C-alpha cells in the first residue's frame, strides 16, 4: 500500500512551504458586504439604514465585496460570482437577500436557500447549491409579514411564502476545480425541478473590487484596472498587482453575449447627482431586467463584465455551463472538452481521499456526511476581511469628512489594520470576525488545515489586531466588548492535536503564549479591579443570559461578580499552566510562569468557593450564581443558567511523571501546599497511589452536585444536549428589582422574545454547540481522573448509573441527533419542513444553525454558522474515544 501523501495534503504542504500558492484563490467572497459596520459612514452608527440591500446593486463598496457563491483572490482584487434572473424578479439575483436587524422579528435573517456542499482546504474543489424560484421573489412579502409578527411568533421564511409550490424552481449548482493555483475550472449545472419548461438568464460575472475611488489606499493599487473582450470567447482582466487573467466561456447554450460596465456608484439613482462615470455598477441589471441596453458599455470594456446566457430548460432537464479563469501565464492545451470533465472527477476523487484520512473511519455513512458538510461550510466561510480603523474613522483623501459622531465607534482601536482571509461565523449574518467564535473555528480547522488554524490564532495576537493594553478585539460593532477568553484553550488544543504523530510546533506555542501573557494581565487588571479574584467581564458572549445587560453598569449602581467571568479566568489559568509546563521542557524559565498560573488558579478557586459567603458557590442549591454587591450587602442572582457550570470547565490532569523534571515548579508547589494550604487543598486532588493529580475549581462533592442538575431532564438535559437555561425557570421565572425596574428571567427554548443584543440571539434555553463541546471535553478530563470510582445517574432520577466517559458519550449522541435523520428521514435541526425528509432534491442538504430549540431541536438564528456549529464534526470524529485515554484530545 502506498504511503505517499494524498494530493490535497501535498498541496497544503506546497502552500505552507511557499512552493506553490494554492491559497491565492478561494471562496473568500463574502455573502454580504452591505449593512456592515465597515461600510457605515453615518453619524448615527446604523449600518442597516445607511447601506441597505436596495443600495447594494448600485453602490460601490469601500472595504470589500460580496456576491452569490463567488470566488476571489486572497486580497479580493478580482471577483467572480453568479447573477441570475428568472424573467419575473424586479432585480438581478447577484447577492443573497435577507431582513435587516430592525426588519426581522428576531433580528437579521437571510431569506434564501443555499447550501455549502463540499470543499477542500486549498479550494482545489468546491461545490455549493442555490435554489432559485421561477416565480417573482417575494421581497416585500418577507419584509411585511415578518414586520407584522411579534418576537413571540415564528419567523416567516421563504418556504412559508409558497414560492416553491409545484417545485417551480431551479437548482443552480456551482463547482470550482483548480488545475493549478492560477487555473480554475468553473462548472454551472442548472436543473429545472418544475413541471413545465422555464426560462432563466444566467450571468457568470467578473469584476474588480473598487480600490480606485478612495484616494491613496494602504497596500492597494489605485490604478483603474480593466476588463475587456479577449480573443476566442473570453474576457481579459488586467490588474496592476494581480496581473492578467482570462475568463474563457463556452460559446454555446444560447450564444452568450458579454455585457460591460464599471464598478462605480450610480450616484444619479441613489443621491440624485450626476454620475462620475458613464457606466455604473448596476448597468448590467438595467440592461437585462429593464431592457436599457445603453446602460452598458458599447466599447466592450470596463471593470465589471458578465457573460449573459439565455436558457430555456425543459421540465426535469439540466443544462451545464463551463467557464475557466486562468492567469495569462497559463496555457492549457484544451480549455474545455474531455479533460475539463476529467479534472473535475479527479479533484473530487482527491477530496474523497483527503477526507477519508481525516474523518473517523468507523463512523456510519450518515455521520460521515454530516462531518464532510460541516467542513465544507467551514471552508466556504473563509472571507477576505478588510478594515483600517484609522482610515475608516477619518475618511478618505479627497472625499468629504465623515459626519460628527461617526468616529466615536471603536475610537480606541486606531491601530487595528485587518487585511486577511479569516474564518467567519456566518458569511451572511455575521460577515465579520468574532474573537471567541474564531477559537472554535480554529480547533475544527486544525483537523483539515493546521497551518490556517495556527495562522488565524496568531494573527489576533499580533500588534495590528491586539490592543497595546493586551485586549483582543471582539467584533466590529464594538471591538472593546468582552468575549469569553477561550483563545488560550484553542492554542493549547490545536498544539496538542497537531503534536500527535508530528514534530511539535513549539514556535507557534511560544509565540502565542507570550502574547497571551499580555492578554491575561489585561483581564486581571481590568476585570478584577478589586483584587479579590472574582471577575466581572460584561456580557461575555452569552448575550441575554442575565437578568439585565451585563455589558452596562448595573441599574442599581452595584457591582456584579460573574460565575462565568470567574470560571473563564480559572479556565484561562489551566491552559496557560499547561502551555508553560510544555514550554519548560526546553526552557527552564517557563517553570516560573507555570508556578505563577498554578498560584493564580488556586487563588481563584478559593475565591469562587469562599465558605464565608464571599464566593459564588451556593451551598444550599449546589450551584454557582452571579452575585451583586451593593452598599456592603451581597445578594446572589439565583438564575440557573449554563454560566453556573463554567467553573467546572477549569480542570486538568497533572501526572507526576510529566512534572518530575521541573524541580523549581515542584518545589514551589510544595511550598504553596505547606504555607498556603487552603489554596491547593481546595483545587488539587490526588489519586490513590499519589501519581496523578486533578487540578480543578470543584471538589468531588461539588462536581457531583453540579452534574445532578446538569443531567436532570427537568432542568438542563434536553433530548438534544445541554440547555443554556434551566427548564425550572419555565414555571419559576426570576424577578429582580433594581433601579426602580423589574427584570425577569425565564426559560425560552427557541428564539428570544426580547430585542436584547439585536433580538437574534438567545441564551435563555436553547442549545449552543460551543458550550456543549467544552462541557463534553471537561467530562472526559474528570473521567480520566476518576475512572470507575465516580459514577453518575444519567439522566437524573432514571436509575441508570454510568461513568463520566459514558455520560459524555450519551450527551454527544444527543447533540449528534440534531443533524442525523431519524426513522422517518427527519433531521431535528430542519424543524417540521417535510421537504428535507421526503424530497430527493432536499433530503441530503444539511444546515448548521447558530443554536437549537432546546425541546424540539429545530435550528434557530443564523443558518450557516460553520462557524462554531462545525464543532459537531469534532464530536463525531471522537465517537470511538469517549471513554478512552487517547492522548491529545484533552488537556491532560
Q: Where are each of the predicted segments found?
A:
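Acidic, mature catalytic/reactive cores of soluble proteins
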Residues: 2-62, 75-78, 83-892
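Transition-metal
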Residues: 65
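Basic, low-complexity intrinsically disordered segments
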Residues: 68
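Active-site-proximal polar cores
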Residues: 72
Amino acid at each position: 500500500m502506498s504511503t505517499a501523501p494524498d494530493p490535497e495534503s501535498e498541496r497544503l504542504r506546497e502552500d505552507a512551504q511557499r512552493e506553490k500558492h494554492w491559497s491565492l484563490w478561494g471562496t473568500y467572497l463574502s455573502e454580504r458586504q452591505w449593512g456592515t459596520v465597515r461600510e457605515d459612514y453615518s453619524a448615527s452608527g446604523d449600518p442597516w439604514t445607511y447601506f441597505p440591500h436596495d443600495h447594494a446593486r448600485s453602490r460601490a463598496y469601500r472595504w470589500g465585496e460580496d456576491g452569490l457563491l463567488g470566488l476571489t483572490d486572497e486580497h479580493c482584487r478580482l471577483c467572480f460570482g453568479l447573477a441570475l434572473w428568472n424573467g419575473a424578479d424586479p432585480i438581478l439575483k447577484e447577492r443573497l437577500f435577507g431582513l435587516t436587524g430592525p426588519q426581522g422579528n428576531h433580528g437579521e435573517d437571510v431569506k434564501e436557500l443555499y447550501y455549502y456542499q463540499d470543499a477542500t482546504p486549498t479550494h482545489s474543489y468546491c461545490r455549493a447549491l442555490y435554489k432559485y424560484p421561477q416565480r417573482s421573489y417575494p421581497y416585500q412579502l418577507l419584509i411585511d409579514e415578518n414586520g407584522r409578527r411579534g418576537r413571540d411568533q415564528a419567523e416567516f421564511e421563504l418556504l412559508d411564502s409558497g414560492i416553491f409550490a409545484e417545485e417551480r424552481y431551479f437548482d443552480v449548482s456551482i463547482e470550482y476545480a483548480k488545475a493549478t493555483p492560477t487555473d480554475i475550472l468553473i462548472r454551472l449545472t442548472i436543473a429545472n425541478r418544475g413541471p413545465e419548461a422555464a426560462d432563466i438568464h444566467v450571468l457568470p460575472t467578473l469584476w474588480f473590487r473598487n480600490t480606485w475611488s478612495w484616494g491613496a489606499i494602504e497596500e492597494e493599487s489605485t490604478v483603474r484596472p480593466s476588463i475587456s473582450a479577449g480573443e476566442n470567447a473570453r474576457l481579459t482582466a488586467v490588474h496592476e498587482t494581480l496581473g492578467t487573467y482570462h475568463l474563457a466561456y463556452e460559446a454555446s447554450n444560447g450564444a452568450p453575449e458579454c455585457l460591460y460596465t464599471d464598478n462605480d456608484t450610480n450616484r444619479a439613482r441613489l443621491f440624485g447627482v450626476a454620475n462620475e462615470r458613464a457606466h455604473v455598477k448596476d448597468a448590467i441589471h438595467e440592461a437585462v431586467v429593464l431592457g436599457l441596453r445603453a446602460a452598458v458599455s458599447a466599447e466592450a470594456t470596463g471593470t465589471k463584465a458578465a457573460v449573459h446566457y439565455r436558457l430555456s430548460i425543459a421540465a426535469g432537464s439540466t443544462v451545464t455551463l463551463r467557464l475557466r479563469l486562468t492567469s495569462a501565464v497559463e496555457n492549457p492545451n484544451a480549455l474545455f472538452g474531455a479533460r475539463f470533465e476529467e479534472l473535475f472527477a479527479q479533484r473530487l476523487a482527491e477530496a474523497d481521499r483527503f477526507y477519508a484520512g481525516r474523518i473517523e473511519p468507523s463512523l456510519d455513512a450518515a455521520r460521515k456526511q454530516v462531518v464532510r458538510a460541516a467542513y465544507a461550510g467551514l471552508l466556504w466561510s473563509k472571507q477576505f476581511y478588510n478594515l483600517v480603523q484609522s482610515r475608516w474613522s477619518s475618511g478618505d483623501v479627497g472625499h468629504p469628512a465623515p459626519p460628527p459622531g461617526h468616529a466615536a465607534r471603536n475610537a480606541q482601536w486606531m491601530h487595528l489594520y485587518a487585511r486577511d482571509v479569516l474564518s467567519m461565523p456566518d458569511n451572511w449574518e455575521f460577515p465579520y470576525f468574532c474573537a471567541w467564535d474564531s477559537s472554535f473555528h480554529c480547533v475544527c480547522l486544525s483537523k483539515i488545515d493546521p497551518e490556517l488554524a495556527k495562522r488565524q490564532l496568531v494573527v489576533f495576537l499580533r500588534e495590528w489586531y491586539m490592543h497595546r493594553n493586551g485586549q483582543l478585539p471582539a467584533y466590529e460593532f464594538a471591538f472593546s466588548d468582552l468575549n469569553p477568553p477561550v483563545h488560550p484553550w484553542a492554542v493549547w488544543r490545536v498544539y496538542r492535536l497537531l503534536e500527535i504523530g508530528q514534530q511539535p510546533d513549539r514556535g507557534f506555542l511560544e509565540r502565542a503564549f507570550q502574547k497571551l501573557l499580555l492578554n491575561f494581565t489585561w483581564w486581571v487588571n481590568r476585570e478584577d479591579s478589586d483584587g479579590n479574584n472574582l471577575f466581572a467581564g460584561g456580557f461575555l458572549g452569552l448575550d441575554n443570559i442575565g437578568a439585565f445587560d451585563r455589558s452596562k453598569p448595573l441599574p442599581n449602581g452595584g457591582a456584579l461578580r460573574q460565575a462565568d467571568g470567574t470560571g473563564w479566568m480559572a479556565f484561562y489559568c489551566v491552559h496557560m499552566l499547561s502551555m508553560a509546563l510544555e514550554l519548560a521542557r526546553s526552557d527552564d524559565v517557563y517553570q516560573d510562569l507555570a508556578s505563577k498560573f498554578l498560584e493564580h488558579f488556586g487563588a481563584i478557586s478559593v475565591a469562587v468557593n469562599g465558605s464565608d459567603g464571599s464566593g459564588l458557590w451556593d451551598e444550599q442549591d449546589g450551584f454557582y450564581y452571579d452575585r451583586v454587591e451593593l452598599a456592603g450587602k451581597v445578594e446572589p442572582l439565583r438564575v440557573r443558567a449554563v454560566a453556573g457550570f463554567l467553573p467546572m470547565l477549569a480542570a486538568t490532569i497533572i501526572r507526576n511523571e510529566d512534572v518530575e523534571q521541573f524541580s523549581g515548579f515542584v518545589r514551589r508547589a510544595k511550598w504553596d501546599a505547606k504555607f498556603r494550604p487552603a489554596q491547593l487543598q481546595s483545587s488539587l486532588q490526588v489519586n490513590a497511589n499519589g501519581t496523578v493529580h486533578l487540578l480543578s475549581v470543584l471538589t468531588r462533592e461539588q462536581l457531583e452536585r453540579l452534574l445532578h442538575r446538569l443531567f436532570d431532564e427537568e432542568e438542563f438535559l434536553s433530548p438534544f444536549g445541554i440547555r443554556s437555561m434551566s427548564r425550572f425557570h419555565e414555571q419559576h421565572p426570576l424577578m429582580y428589582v433594581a433601579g426602580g425596574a423589574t427584570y425577569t428571567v425565564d426559560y425560552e427554548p427557541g428564539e428570544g422574545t426580547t430585542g436584547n443584543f439585536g433580538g437574534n440571539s438567545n441564551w435563555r434555553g436553547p442549545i449552543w454547540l460551543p458550550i456543549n463541546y467544552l462541557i463534553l471535553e471537561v467530562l472526559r478530563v474528570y473521567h480520566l481522573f476518576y475512572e470507575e470510582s465516580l459514577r453518575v445517574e444519567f439522566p437524573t432520577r432514571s436509575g441508570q448509573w454510568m461513568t463520566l466517559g459514558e455520560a459524555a458519550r450519551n450527551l454527544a449522541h444527543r447533540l449528534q441527533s440534531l443533524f442525523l435523520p431519524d426513522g422517518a428521514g427527519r433531521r431535528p435541526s430542519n424543524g417540521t419542513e417535510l421537504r428535507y425528509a421526503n424530497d430527493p432534491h432536499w433530503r441530503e442538504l444539511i444546515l448548521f444553525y447558530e443554536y437549537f430549540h432546546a425541546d424540539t431541536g429545530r435550528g434557530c438564528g443564523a443558518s450557516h454558522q460553520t462557524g462554531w456549529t462545525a464543532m459537531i464534526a469534532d464530536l463525531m470524529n471522537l465517537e470511538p474515544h469517549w471513554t478512552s485515554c487517547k492522548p491529545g484530545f484533552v488537556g491532560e
